[in-house]
């Protein structure tokens, strides 16, 4: 049978924001410039098709974009979006050379895009936090300055889910070409929970779809300010799988990682446990605050032994901003329903681990079983602020605890009576950066393979590619390996595709198999 040529389908919008690599040494101007060759190599390795180029970290970023990065990205087949910071982020450092003159920025970027067709548009960070500056009238001037030079120049504001509503869109609809929505759990600002990601993406999609606006979902691959730690590899994995499902269903038109690190070394500032790598954390993010009486807790059932003498030594710490008042939050330890220890969150220095020893004999004598609970409780006040506390290295006498050192997530249950109190065993991962990189590479290349086969492969292969994607989205690693093996065998036996196409897809399958072997 004669092999038919198939046109290449348009690449899916799989992107990355910032996380740029810098040259190891400064140039003659004293600045470490963007390391374009290494950055392009990493983006290609990841399978990135769209890169949000942040102009902020160095005064030479604009010139590096114009003279080095854009031509290299064009040759590599990568589309570029200039990412600008708003006035709220420009108090100390501005985007050079035009600062907060965004009319000048749009004019300059529009002119540059006439020379580089892969320069697609502009993304404005934290747009909804700067509406007093970005009035519809001013945004119209920005847009006009760019469109006058290049009518195809696009503007996608970066907006959070909580600001996406019909009244807002009614004012700005004619000024947007699409929206970038960064997921951080809505009003409960964190990078620990993903349970509402797909619901928020679906609702935002329906709202924007009525206006004819595409939605790009951005998920955190690195630290969000005022949170306990970087998002775990597991969090990034869940976020990307949810994003791929939304992309597959057509609810979003693109998926982007927020600051995916491309150099891999331990993030030692995240190693905050008293001993080892893990500790029990209770976190209240900035946003809607718990009311007095609201709480989160870490609990374990215990069975006191027959010794008749019971003690507990434990370690605890607090992290909070300066505006937290004394008396608003307390840490507690309970036996059953009785509070046996309490201390104000502000007692002691920030991040300082303190040791406490309690005599629990009066509370445990004669009991066959009960519970040990550590709590974070709001006592009074209503001011919104973020904070978190930690417990670690519990040394019991007269009873046993499972994973008293919090080096494993099991053994402890986390509960709260308010969604703004988030509990989790946080375990420092010295290989987090590499693991997140490999997870992203696997996800992106899987979707590329699925997209290419579903667009131009014969029906039997399309079904197998869809099965492979569903296994990835479902987190079923063993099924993915099996699906890849079956797909490879089917390709080797196929006689309807050009040999070059078969070889390309087989090479992609082999690459995915290697990634899964390294980071299962």
Give residue spans per PLM region.
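Extracellular carbohydrate recognition and processing domains
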Residues: 335-368, 379-382, 410-412, 424
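Extracellular beta-strand-rich recognition modules
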Residues: 310-318, 368-378, 392, 406
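Glycan-processing catalytic domains of CAZymes
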Residues: 2-269, 418-455
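Short carbohydrate-recognition loop motifs
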Residues: 269-295, 422-429
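Short beta-strands within extracellular/lumenal beta-sheet-rich domains
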Residues: 284-308, 353-357
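Extended, low-complexity, turn-rich repeat/linker tracts enriched in Gly/Pro/Ser/Thr and Asp/Glu
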Residues: 291, 305-307, 317-328, 379-383
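Soluble extracellular-acting proteins and domains
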Residues: 450-520
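Extracellular carbohydrate recognition
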Residues: 293-295, 326, 378-400, 429-432
């Amino acid at each position: 049978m004669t092999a038919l040529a198939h046109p290449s389908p348009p690449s899916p919008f799989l992107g990355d924001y910032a996380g740029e690599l810098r040259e190891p040494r400064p140039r003659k101007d004293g600045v470490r410039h963007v390391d374009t060759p290494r950055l392009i190599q990493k983006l290609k390795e990841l399978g990135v098709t769209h890169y949000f180029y942040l102009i902020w970290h160095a005064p030479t970023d604009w010139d590096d974009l114009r003279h080095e990065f854009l031509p290299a990205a064009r040759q590599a087949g990568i589309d570029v979006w200039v990412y600008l910071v708003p006035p709220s982020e420009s108090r100390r450092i501005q985007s050079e050379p035009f600062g907060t003159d965004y009319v000048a920025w749009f004019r300059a970027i529009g002119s540059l895009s006439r020379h580089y067709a892969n320069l697609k548009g502009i993304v404005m960070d934290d747009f909804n936090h700067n509406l007093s500056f970005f009035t519809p009238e001013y945004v119209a001037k920005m847009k006009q300055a760019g469109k006058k030079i290049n009518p195809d120049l696009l503007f996608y504001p970066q907006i959070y889910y909580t600001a996406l509503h019909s009244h807002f869109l009614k004012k700005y609809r004619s000024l947007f070409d699409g929206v970038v929505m960064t997921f951080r759990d809505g009003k409960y600002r964190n990078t620990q929970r993903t349970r509402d990601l797909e619901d928020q993406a679906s609702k935002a999609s329906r709202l924007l779809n009525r206006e004819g606006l595409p939605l790009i979902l951005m998920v955190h691959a690195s630290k969000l300010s005022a949170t306990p730690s970087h998002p775990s590899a597991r969090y990034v994995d869940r976020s990307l799988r949810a994003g791929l499902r939304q992309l597959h269903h057509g609810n979003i038109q693109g998926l982007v990682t927020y600051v995916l690190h491309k150099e891999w070394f331990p993030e030692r500032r995240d190693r905050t446990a008293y001993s080892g790598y893990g500790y029990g954390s209770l976190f209240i993010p900035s946003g809607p605050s718990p009311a007095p009486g609201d709480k989160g807790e870490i609990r374990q059932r215990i069975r006191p032994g027959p010794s008749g003498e019971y003690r507990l030594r434990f370690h605890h710490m607090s992290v909070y901003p300066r505006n937290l008042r004394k008396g608003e939050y307390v840490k507690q330890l309970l036996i059953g329903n009785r509070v046996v220890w309490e201390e104000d969150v502000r007692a002691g220095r920030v991040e300082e681990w303190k040791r406490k020893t309690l005599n629990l004999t009066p509370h445990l004598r004669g009991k066959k079983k009960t519970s040990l609970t550590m709590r974070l409780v709001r006592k009074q006040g209503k001011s919104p602020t973020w904070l978190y506390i930690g417990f670690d290295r519990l040394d019991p006498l007269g009873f046993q605890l499972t994973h008293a050192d919090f080096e494993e997530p099991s053994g402890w249950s986390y509960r709260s009576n308010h969604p703004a109190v988030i509990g989790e065993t946080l375990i420092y991962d010295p290989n987090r950066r590499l693991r997140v990189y490999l997870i992203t590479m696997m996800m992106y290349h899987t979707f590329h393979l699925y997209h290419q086969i579903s667009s131009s492969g014969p029906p039997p292969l399309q079904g197998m590619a869809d099965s492979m994607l569903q296994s990835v989205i479902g987190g079923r690693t063993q099924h993915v390996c099996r699906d890849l093996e079956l797909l490879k065998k089917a390709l080797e036996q196929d006689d309807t595709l050009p040999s070059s196409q078969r070889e390309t897809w087989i090479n992609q399958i082999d690459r995915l198999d290697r990634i899964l072997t390294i980071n299962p």
